[in-house]
């Protein structure tokens, strides 16, 4: 089989070739003549944990359904392990899907739910026995094999759904918001289990989620979608630290955005005057767009901003303001600061267990030139 490959670098910097498990080439999907998926291009490498992240209605679930075969591509190409998937039904694709709703059969116990797909394929009884046993062991559900779904917790049902997907030994496991129905504590626990399962099996996982933290913590790479299009693909660190668009900067985590125009453009820094009159200096580095437009957006993460009662000496990006809200979050404290030009900014600082300042306290907010990022202002931003 001639499988497409992608170039990557190992930790020593030596280029190697990795096969691609899933490829989308300029893929479109229309509903009522409106594009739900609009010219999507992406490659998913073999053994990768790849997440498609975006808000409701962005096209991420439709993209997953196209890969699974539940929807058909209207234009473009979709390949799995180098083979075109045009008109290939779901049951003939080397993929299995884990749904948010689990989709377990209530009248079947755990063992029979996991065995269902193998029996449908008329697998030998001995093979069904060994593979179901192996799958249940992977998800730590051997002792509950005789229970019915109604007798299981949400986390246990999720494990059964995972086992049912893994028992068929697919090349690609598709996860449709798999942890969305779980409470926060259980979701955190299942994130760890899902990550360990992926590492132990070495399979390709493609997950759809709207949960930024979930995508950042689990993924090797993330594709951020918006209005049917891919805004950016990168590692979690690249997506968070080096967003390419203001949508990505705003959607991934929290950020403070300032729209303005470049007034000084030097080799080492950029000076921007915002629409509200602030002058912000941004250090130029490898993350700065090669071609900057006159209109830009400055992104500053809340955790990059410092607060002090007195102005630091000879420092750019220092602005006077007042505290208008203080929110205690346990390990951190979130401050809402209104700058002298009337703009509100969010500041996140570690909890030092001291007395919190009162509201209306005059304060100075400042950040380093290297802690903010200039992004080209697009027409739809």
Swiss-Prot record:
EC number: 7.6.2.11
InterPro entries for the chain: AAA+_ATPase (IPR003593), ABC_SmlMolc_Importer (IPR050093), ABC_transporter-like_ATP-bd (IPR003439), ABC_transporter-like_CS (IPR017871), Mo/tungstate-bd_C_term_dom (IPR008995), P-loop_NTPase (IPR027417), PotA-like (IPR005893), PotA_ATP-bd (IPR017879)
Enzyme class (EC, first level): translocase
Gene name of the record: potA
SUPFAM superfamilies: MOP-like (SSF50331), P-loop containing nucleoside triphosphate hydrolases (SSF52540)
Organism: Trichormus variabilis (strain ATCC 29413 / PCC 7937) (Anabaena variabilis)
Chief subcellular location: membrane
Function: Part of the ABC transporter complex PotABCD involved in spermidine/putrescine import. Responsible for energy coupling to the transport system.
Catalytic reaction list: ATP + H2O + polyamine-[polyamine-binding protein]Side 1 = ADP + phosphate + polyamineSide 2 + [polyamine-binding protein]Side 1
Subunit relationships: The complex is composed of two ATP-binding proteins (PotA), two transmembrane proteins (PotB and PotC) and a solute-binding protein (PotD).
Stated name of the protein: Spermidine/putrescine import ATP-binding protein PotA
Record Pfam families: ABC_tran, TOBE_2
């Amino acid at each position: 089989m001639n499988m497409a490959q992608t170039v990557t670098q190992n930790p020593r910097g030596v280029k190697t070739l990795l096969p691609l498990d899933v490829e989308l080439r300029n893929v479109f999907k229309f509903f009522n003549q409106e594009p739900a998926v609009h010219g999507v291009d992406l490659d998913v490498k073999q053994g990768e944990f790849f997440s498609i992240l975006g808000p409701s209605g962005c096209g991420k679930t439709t993209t997953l359904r196209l890969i699974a075969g539940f929807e058909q591509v209207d234009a473009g190409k979709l390949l799995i392990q180098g083979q075109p998937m045009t008109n290939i039904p779901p049951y003939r694709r080397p993929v299995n899907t884990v749904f948010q709703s689990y989709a377990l059969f209530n009248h079947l116990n755990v063992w029979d739910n996991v065995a269902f797909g193998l029996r449908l394929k008329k697998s030998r009884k001995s093979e069904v026995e060994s593979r179901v046993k192996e799958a249940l062991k992977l998800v730590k559900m051997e002792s509950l094999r005789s229970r019915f779904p109604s007798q299981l917790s949400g986390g246990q049902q999720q494990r059964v759904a995972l086992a049912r997907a893994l028992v068929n030994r697919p090349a690609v496991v598709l996860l449709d918001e798999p942890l969305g129905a779980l409470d926060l504590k259980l979701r955190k626990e299942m994130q760890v289990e899902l990550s360990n399962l992926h590492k132990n099996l070495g399979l390709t996982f493609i997950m759809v989620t709207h949960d930024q933290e979930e995508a950042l913590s689990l993924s090797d790479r993330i594709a951020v979608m918006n209005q049917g299009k891919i805004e950016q693909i990168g590692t979690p660190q690249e997506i968070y630290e080096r967003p390419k668009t203001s949508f990505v900067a705003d959607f991934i985590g929290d950020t403070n955005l300032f729209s303005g125009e470049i007034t000084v453009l030097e080799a080492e820094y950029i000076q921007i005057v915002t629409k509200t009159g602030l002058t912000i200096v941004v250090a130029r580095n490898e993350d700065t767009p090669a071609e900057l437009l006159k209109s830009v957006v400055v992104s500053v993460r809340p955790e990059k901003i410092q607060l002090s009662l007195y102005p630091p000496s000879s420092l750019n990006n220092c602005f006077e303001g007042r505290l208008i809200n203080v929110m205690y979050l346990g390990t951190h404290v979130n401050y809402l600061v209104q700058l002298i030009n009337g703009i509100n900014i969010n500041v996140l600082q570690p909890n030092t267990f001291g007395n919190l300042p009162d509201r209306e306290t005059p304060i100075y907010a400042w950040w380093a030139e290297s802690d903010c990022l200039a992004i080209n202002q697009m027409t739809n931003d």
